[in-house]
Amino acid sequence: MSVPPIQSGYPVAGTVVDDELGDPLPRKSEIKEFSEDSGPEDAYAGYGENPFADEAVAEHWRQVYQESQYECRHVFDPTLTWSEEEEKAIIRKLDWRVCLWACVMFFGLQVDRGNLVQAVSDNMLDDLGLNTNDYNYGNTVFLISFLFAELPSQLLSKKIGPDRWIPTQICLWSIVASSQFFISGNGSFLLTRALLGVLEGGFIPDLVLWLSYFYTSRELPIRLSYFWTTLSVTTILTSLLAFALLHMRGVLGYAGWRWLFLIEGLITLLVGIASFFLMPASAVQTKTWFRPNGWFSDREVAIVVNRVLRDDPSKGDMHNRQALTPRRLWQTLKDYDLWPLYILGLIIFIPQSPPTKYLTLIVKSLGFSTFNTNLLTIPSSVFHIITLLAITRLSEYFNERTLVAMIQAVWTLPCVIALEWWPGMIDNKWGTFALVTVLLSYPYCHAILVAWTSKNSNNVGTRSVSAALYNMSVQLGNIIANFIYRDDDKPYYRRGNRNLFIINLLAIVLFLLTKAYYIWRNKQKERVWNALSKEEQDHYIKNTRLQGSRRLDFRFAH
């Protein structure tokens, strides 16, 4: 049957229609709307709400899962019920088995991409005959390589499965990271930076995709906040480790920063090898020859799978070894309703990036020793963890993304103003340290935006690509940030800080415009939807071929 005519101004042109999965897709569970003052108690509860209660809808999705060869299709059960206590127990098990190891793998990423900051505190630049601009170029080469590897890595991960590709990535980049022990000048420095970028690119969206197999859309932001909390924990641990490793300067005639690269690279290699054994492909594939009992009982497996499907039925419209077609890729690229989130990713992290990368150089320029410099980076990392977890919890509690995420830009604005116009900058040793520490303690909203992008994608194929596109926009912003602090502008970086101030103001404006856009789009959809009769709405739900955010019965989160 065809979709009945929609007499409205709704922009049908450019909508996404997918003919690859057979029958038209029915309505998804995100239809339920939450008010502005919704709390956690209003969140989706798999033991209570069931979008498959309609037998026709359940049968349709059963056919979709069968046609896509979805790996969990044999445990799909529209009639399954479970208690709140059972679900909480399973979430705890998922946090211990899935989320914790995701954090360990992210630790491996951050160790090898972040230890350059500690290395330069040990006179690495002087040892190699490099200056500030060379350091910037190295960071830029890394980010450009990282940027261009994002989408190919995501496509490869979707083809062979993140459980295979992610451990391979970790092992490969750890070998390159260790090889930095042997760099001898600008050429080898840039080469290793490029290789690290190529091999690490796509890791984050790959891991987010894997996490989405186990968690619902309301649970994912908090797990991602744990994920990015690891970034700060890693900074603390590597600062302490650097304190020890940099004392190895002179051992066998080598500089301490060389030992830092070698030893931390080998640590990451161990994480990569372990990941081959600790990353199951899905909830139904935890039993292996080395883990014969698996992670879950048969009932727990059924609950894990069905709670995720009831939150988002489209999570089963592709299997976990299925490549994205060029058609699906193009559909995601032209989904203009996700562009506001990509623009936010491009801009909002720039004001924090230069101070973060230059933290050890700034602190050391204040007269602190190499070892005290690394220890003094710890306070901002500790506070960063607290504010990150707080802002993500706040977003979940109020079911508010835009205004809560905007707290990051509001936090950094007065700090950036002080960087530019405070007369005691650099000259006041402890005042400068306190200012930079407060700035870098900002509430990181990245977890909110990643989960926000995932939710507004509203489709597995779109979600896997949009995660990469969002992360690419963030990396592009980091590339821009690398050219804000320049060698001819130090030590006060007045020109650079003035640019950070302007960008910080722009970030606040973009947050407000993004919220206004999604409110407008939801009202537009609501107007068209309400113009349909009940029969037309039912017909649309069961027969439309529109997918993802293009559906009239989908509402954007904001």
Question: Model segments located where?
Answer:
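Cytosolic juxtamembrane N-terminal segment immediately preceding the first transmembrane helix
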Residues: 2-115, 126, 552
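Extracytoplasmic
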Residues: 97-132, 148, 153, 238-242, ...
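Helix-breaking motifs and short loop linkers at transmembrane-helix boundaries and internal kinks
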Residues: 112, 128-129, 152, 160-161, ...
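Extracytoplasmic gate region of multi-pass secondary transporters
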Residues: 117-118, 324-392, 446, 450, ...
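Central cavity-lining transmembrane alpha-helices of secondary-active solute carriers
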Residues: 140-155, 378-390
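Conserved MFS/SLC helix-loop-helix module at the cytosolic interface between two early adjacent transmembrane helices
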Residues: 148-187
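Structural signature of the two symmetry-related core transmembrane helices
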Residues: 164-178, 403-418
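Central mid-sequence intracellular linker of multi-pass
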Residues: 218-231, 250-329, 495, 500-538
